[in-house]
């Protein structure tokens, strides 16, 4: 059940070995591979096959290792999935007041995300960034979109953390959140979604805290 960390992981041979070892002894070891996206030499076989940097080579090796294990152990319950993260700037405007001078008022009304997030930010990236700041949440956990019917931007992470990126908080949404069972251990809202409705914000905190 250990976690193996490999800096400068190259083609991810460590990940390959760990996956094979798990398959052999039914272990549950996990791995974290860290590698700069160094470009492959243009004369190399990897480059000729379409892999422009060593990270792409590593990802393909992990995929092939997983496929090989699945073919060799067709009836085994083995997790061969993996996630890929890249170092990047923040997706969130943590100090919106500093950016207000750069925001068009009409744009604020038609695109509320302009207030809170950088252009092009995706919900999944925002959720992961928020979870990174929780310190004790593994990034291997699943993200689940829990509602529909007009509330497509509310997510449950690791079955414990609720991240609500809806542009407007409503009483109907709060009712839905209060009905969740089991209840998340933490709720994360965007302040702008309350649209300066202090009474609604107080009611939201009161109801969810009381639960």
Where are these regions (language model features)?
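A phosphate-binding catalytic loop at a beta-strand-loop-alpha-helix junction
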Residues: 2-21, 131
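Accessory, often C-terminal, charged low-complexity segments
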Residues: 1, 21-211
């Amino acid at each position: 059940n250990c976690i193996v960390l490999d800096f400068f992981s190259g083609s991810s041979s460590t990940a390959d070995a760990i996956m094979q070892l798990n398959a052999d002894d039914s272990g549950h070891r996990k791995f974290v591979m860290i590698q700069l996206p160094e470009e492959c030499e243009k004369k190399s076989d990897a480059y000729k096959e379409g892999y422009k940097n060593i990270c792409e080579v590593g990802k393909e090796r992990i995929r092939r290792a997983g496929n090989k294990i699945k073919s060799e152990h067709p009836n085994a319950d083995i997790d061969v999935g993996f996630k890929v993260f890249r170092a990047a700037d923040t997706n969130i405007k943590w100090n919106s007041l500093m950016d207000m001078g750069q925001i068009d008022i009409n744009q604020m009304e038609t695109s509320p995300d302009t207030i809170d997030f950088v252009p092009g930010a995706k919900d999944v990236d925002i959720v992961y960034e928020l979870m990174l700041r929780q310190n004790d949440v593994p990034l291997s956990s699943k993200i689940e979109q829990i509602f529909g019917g007009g509330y497509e931007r509310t997510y449950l992470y690791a079955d414990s953390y609720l991240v609500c990126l809806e542009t407007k908080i409503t009483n109907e949404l709060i009712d839905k959140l209060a009905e969740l069972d089991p209840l998340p251990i933490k709720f994360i809202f965007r302040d702008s979604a309350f649209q300066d409705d202090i009474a609604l914000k107080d009611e939201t905190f009161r109801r969810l805290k009381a639960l």
